[in-house]
Swiss-Prot record:
Ferredoxins are iron-sulfur proteins that transfer electrons in a wide variety of metabolic reactions. This is Probable ferredoxin TA0517. Binds 2 [4Fe-4S] clusters. It comes from the Archaea. [4Fe-4S] cluster 2 binds at C27, C46, C49, C52. The keyword Transport applies.
Length: 70
């Protein structure tokens, strides 16, 4: 049986992000990396654990699929 998983895009609010890198350190699959001016999320590597969302001190990362706290 094939399992299909629909992924929705994660959003990083550039006005809230202070580029501290906390999300990078929280990601267990190295799906997030920090450029000098941009947080990049590799959607194919993301396992939707929510660690980056909860670990962000400014609340800059959001996703439609994430509701609640870890």
């Amino acid at each position: 049986m094939v399992e299909l998983k629909v992924k929705t895009e994660m959003d990083v609010d550039r006005n809230l992000c202070n580029y501290c890198g906390a999300c990078v350190g929280m990601c267990p699959t190295d799906a997030i990396w920090l450029d000098e001016t941009v947080i990049k999320i590799h959607e194919e590597k993301c396992i939707e654990c929510g660690f980056c969302i909860v670990g962000c001190p400014t609340g800059a990362i959001t996703a439609e699929w994430f509701h609640g706290n870890l």
